[in-house]
């Protein structure tokens, strides 16, 4: 065949494209299990951080040792399923994104032996997705710790939602509101309540508001579950308290 002909060029190009595509497809298939394992470990690391559980040398072992239950609930607060703890089954960001529009929803709740309950959130930031995990105290209303992440927020500004320890620390002790706005991240002058929000990051107003909107939306998803289980928790606590004998002998 004439190597200078158009036919040769076309055939050569087609063969080259097919070979490269096959190599890339094989590489993607070969690397997929490793990539999925890394995503799972990263997700669990963030969940553990929100639960204030120090990850050991093996993140998966730490999770299995410290988790008490991993369940799925709907927006009515009813349990609709369980996640496999032995397999370290968790919802990654793709599944969290799907749950935003899913009907009915199956929302993950991670309950740890130290009394912390962790719920996730996922939404849109300024330049890409943002997500996070919120750990609640036993009253299921007071925040113990948070862990946030992002993909593409501006370094030194919006990226501080994940990189700035003081921002995450500001959430400790805050509570979820009871009105239309459950939580907000705005400038101090614009905040409606002191307890149900934190200050926006200076220079990153849009990212801060986006995270506030994301938290507000997901707290809304979990509102019924949190309120129902607060009542259960209170009843259990009351049952454990022995009545005081006020009659003098």
What do these predicted regions represent?
Residues 2-249:
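Flexible, solvent-exposed loop/hinge segments and secondary-structure transition points
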